[in-house]
Amino acid sequence: MSRTPLRLFAVFFLGLTLIACSKGQQTSTSDKSQQILRMTIGSLPGTIDPHQATDSPGIKVLAALNEALLTTDYQTFELKPGVAESWQVLDEGLRYRFQLRDNAKWSNGEPVTAQDFVYSWQRMLSAGLGNQFALDYYVIKNAGPYHKGELKDFSQVGVKALSERELEIVLERRDPLFLKRVAYEVTAPVHKATVEKHGAMDDPTNKWIRAGNHVGNGPFKLVYWELNQTMRLVKNPHYWDADAIKLEEIQILPVESETIEERMYRSGQVHLVYGSRLPVDKIAYYRTEKPDEFFSQTAYATYFYLFNTKKAPFDNVDVRKAFAYSIDKKLLTGSITKNHEAPAYALSPISASYQPPQMPQFNPALAREHLTKAGYPNGQGIPRITLTYNTFEIHQKLAVAIQQMWKRELNVDVALENQEWKVFLDFRQNLQHFIARAGSSSTFADPLDLLGSLTTGHGMNDTGWSNAEFDRLIRASYEAADDSERFALLHQAETILLEEMPLLPLFYYNYSYLKKPEVRNFEFNMVDHPNYKGVFIDAAASR
């Protein structure tokens, strides 16, 4: 069932008329006297709870509202101090100590302490909350048993407050990415009194994240957020590095259409289109006519489809291979996406340090062989199949093209279904799909980050697929002596992934953005992660 027409009309009306709402007066980019950044991010986030967020819009908002122990310079991937002003790596990478800065405060003015992190990491690892990234932190001593409910006493988990300003984390095994994980916003602290005022610590429906309730420790604080209305974040005066924050406010408009985003930009209603994708028919125009406002960024990210391996016919690997080998990816990137994307024949992007194995390229004859082997010659007898994607024009265009390829090459009819973002995320995570659109970027620009999400039981594994040898190789990569050995193990794991084909890589992203000249110091990067420090509106730049 599609809700696209009504949804697009509502968004179109929103995009072309500046709506004033209670508690939130919107501005226009024509008013250059205020330090207010107006932007779109593809859609509003599914949640702004750091221990539940998984989507790109959510992470972009969390970067403004929350801060973890460390931060990352996403131009160089160098780790920087966050709440922790310094840190030590001890016992050959099995013990970490973080010294928290004295002036770290919550948005209500209270100090951020080491005990806040103990509470927050206990919450992050609580089974009832449903944290999708919890498995990534099983390297912490007893984190796995606690998350599984086998251990009830969190004091036995390797997260301890040694003092008000010193936090210690003890691991059971080394993790080459651990400090990078510590710098990710999903590990940011939450304010205990605020969380428990509005519900249980591990209640996923807790209302503490609502405007008026929310307390964070990032450079901005939430003041307004209602369904289908502009989200407003204002500067947090208690943030420890408040002098580096030049913006007084960020306004994020609720748009789930790249066409409407571009129209709003063109009409001066937003400074920044930051949803990672522009309308295909506008890319060439901005690239040639307004190159100073158009930004294209090669991304460490992959666009792919997920097969539900728990549901027929995709419980059969030959069906998955048939559907995978019948896609002409070069046609998709050359005729539909048109932003110089590279076709993907693996989940992991190719980099200087890691060359992933490659699946077969477009091979309709081989695809038909696999479909026949699965018992569906010429598509006969195959169950009804639906491809589900979230509402966005480019997803629809790609889905229609791929639907036609499956019909032409396999004689299989596939229905299409689009859903709004939050509905789509729940639908996919609950394995209700046959085939679902997905996209994944590594916050760390590392293949382990992508491949690790396909291990058994990982909260981001929306395929239902499980392979013991794949899991073993991923675990072994944590203990590798060096990157050469680590990447060799990951290569073996990815070879299994491509042989089992629980997902279908389509292409590697090239992000495309629009930014007004008056927006200064906003930098784009290969993992689509914002840094709001130092960003300001330069009124003189638009004159």
Question: Model-found features: residue ranges?
Answer:
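Append "and occasionally in soluble cytosolic enzymes with long acidic Gly/Pro-rich linkers
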Residues: 235, 314-404, 408, 466, ...
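Gly/Pro-rich hinge or "lid" segments in bacterial periplasmic/extracellular proteins
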Residues: 74, 165, 170-244, 249, ...
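Surface-exposed binding/hinge segments that line
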Residues: 99, 125, 129-196
